[in-house]
Amino acid sequence: MSISKDDILNAVAEMSVMDVVALIEAMEEKFGVSASAAVAAAGPAEAADEQTEFNVVMTSFGEKKVAVIKAVRGATGLGLKEAKDLVESLGVVKEGVEKAEAEELKKTLEEAGASVEIK
């Protein structure tokens, strides 16, 4: 006579929480495994889903190119030529910044007339 999985699940469903905890501990001891290992492995996957570093990318400098160049110079500390080249290339303005800093930079550049994305 063998017990089916459904019989085991029904028996566990009728147990109290304390009985289930005791059953898990007994199974860990008998089979030399740990139920917490699966939970620990799932933890880093959740952390990977949340992005912590962002890139601020300019998609257009609009009609106010000079104002955008000034805003880029102020935000990055670049010289005039470097800031002008960066604005004209429509590339990444800043890489690997925190979300708050990225949002602030986006706001500053958009006020100057640029179109900006945070990636």
UniProtKB/Swiss-Prot annotation:
Gene3D superfamilies in alphabetical order: 3.30.1390.10, Single helix bin
GO molecular function terms listed in the Swiss-Prot or TrEMBL record: mRNA binding; structural constituent of ribosome
Source species, domain of life: Bacteria
Keywords annotated in UniProt: Ribonucleoprotein, Ribosomal protein
Role of this protein: Forms part of the ribosomal stalk which helps the ribosome interact with GTP-bound translation factors. Is thus essential for accurate translation.
Assembly notes: Homodimer. Part of the ribosomal stalk of the 50S ribosomal subunit. Forms a multimeric L10(L12)X complex, where L10 forms an elongated spine to which 2 to 4 L12 dimers bind in a sequential fashion. Binds GTP-bound translation factors.
Keyword Ribosomal protein: yes
UniProt similarity note: Belongs to the bacterial ribosomal protein bL12 family.
InterPro entries for the chain: Ribosomal_bL12, Ribosomal_bL12_C, Ribosomal_bL12_C/ClpS-like, Ribosomal_bL12_oligo, Ribosomal_bL12_oligo_N_sf
SUPFAM superfamilies associated with the record: ClpS-like, Ribosomal protein L7/12, oligomerisation (N-terminal) domain
Record organism: Colwellia psychrerythraea (strain 34H / ATCC BAA-681) (Vibrio psychroerythus)
Annotated GO CC locations: cytosolic large ribosomal subunit
One of the protein's GO biological processes: translation
Protein's name in the database: Large ribosomal subunit protein bL12
